[in-house]
Amino acid sequence: MMAISRVLIMAAGTGGHVFPALAIARQLEARGVKVDWLGTPGGMEEKLLEGTGYEFHRIAAKGLKGKGIARLIGAPWMLTHSLWQSVLIMREIDPDCVLGMGGYVSGPGGVAARVLRKKLYLHEQNAVVGFTNRLLARIATRVFEAFPGAFAESDKVVFVGNPVRADIEQVGQTLPELASTTRPLRLLILGGSQGAKAINETLPQALARLRETDPHAVPEVRHQTGASQLEATQAAYTDAGFSLANGLTVTPFIDDMAAAYAWADLVIGRSGASTVAEIAVVGRASILVPYPHHKDQQQLHNARWLSAASAATIIEQPALSGDRLASEIAALNADRHSLLAMATAAHALAPRRVDTRIAEIMTEVADAR
């Protein structure tokens, strides 16, 4: 047996790839493994890695989806160049194994790992497998899936879930006390870092409908809008007759998500992979409005994992309205036992200590080579 000492992680472009990779990196580091990172110049991952001590390696990979004819014409050169860069980097640092998180940086890096006969691990964050991971799965040593059944059944596929920050995971140790309480319902609205315009516009309308029906049944609200939509959302609440105080907080970002989840009874938002994983692990009921413009409807399939267990309600964006959302909120507010049942069902679904499990599997398999 040979102890694993160095791992190259490939993750770039979006928080959905980078944040889970960071969680796994910390677990590998805690086991004495040196972590290197393959990313792109000027990508969000480069800034996030500042101060971590992980050595950052850059390749000229770029995404191709929806980038126009010029990008597609240049794709063969770009892919060949980034593959060669990846090979040179791996020859230099000689990692024991490579972990790809999907996305455009994992493509050339994964092929380079194959060329150099490095063990290749993949993690797929969504219920629908992305293009890069779908191709690389054929040559991978292990494939980690965040949603059961994302990949075809195989001895190399392991259902592990999505890594969630430790402070958020700890929230799930206590479920909200809903059934016996008479306090106002607490809504956590997650508009996302980029802002979910449809959700941000509809929430003030829904609260206005609830107030018309029963002024005493208006929930307390913490609403994260995303930076670009803060002013418009604040104006929408003001136009609907709400004061931005006394139980209504509207902010561009939420710094302490663990505290926000602990406070909430019901979460309303998109159904990105990380959000769905967090909702499950903290054990909260949710109303999910999947982002409708992904070609493969990733977020809809993510949300169905919760809804199939009666842990969430899905409202597809074309059906989203103030009346519909108010109706769903009012029904759950009136039946706190159902709200608690949804929270309990979500909590029962969630894998825990996912980053730890992935690190353990990687070191066990690599050590056994």
Where are these regions (language model features)?
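Active-site-proximal region of nucleotide-activated glycan assembly enzymes
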Residues: 34, 55, 114-174
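Acidic donor-binding loop of glycosyltransferase active sites
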Residues: 95-97, 259-277, 284
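A short, well-ordered alpha-helix in the C-terminal region of glycosyltransferases
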Residues: 338-352
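C-terminal alpha-helical cap of glycosyltransferases
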Residues: 351-369
